[in-house]
Design a protein with these regions (language model features):
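Short, Lys/Arg-enriched N-terminal segment that forms or immediately precedes the first helix
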Residues: 1-7
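Helix-turn-helix DNA-binding motif, specifically the short coil turn and the N-cap/start of the second
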Residues: 28, 39-42
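Beta-hairpin "wing" of winged helix-turn-helix
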Residues: 51-61, 68
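Short capping segments at the starts of secondary-structure elements
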Residues: 13, 24-30
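Alpha-helical residues within the helix-turn-helix
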Residues: 34, 45, 51-52
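Conserved segment of winged-helix/HTH DNA-binding domains
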Residues: 3, 65-84
């Protein structure tokens, strides 16, 4: 886990909204973009940054690509923060 990259990814409100939407469920990119009211290109940028920092996991099922939270990373981040 790159703490700097993770924290930087969390600074953007759109990315935080994406993470909130993915809390407890998988979603496809089109549904995320539509719900947020952003372009597919903009969503792709944000999802790539979230994936690069291991905050989101991508999985393929049939003809769809689903995105979901990487809860393991959040557990590690919480444990690290509890040190202080």
């Amino acid at each position: 886990m790159s703490l700097n990259g993770t924290l930087k990814a969390l600074t953007d409100p759109i990315r935080r909204n994406i993470l909130t939407m993915l809390k407890g469920k998988k979603m496809i990119a089109g549904d995320i973009a539509e719900e947020l009211g952003i372009s597919p290109a903009s969503l792709s940028y944000h999802l790539n940054l979230l994936k690069k920092n291991d905050l989101v996991i991508e999985s393929k099922e049939k003809n769809y690509v689903y995105y979901e939270l990487n809860t393991t990373l959040f557990d590690e981040l919480i444990m690290w923060l509890k040190q202080f």
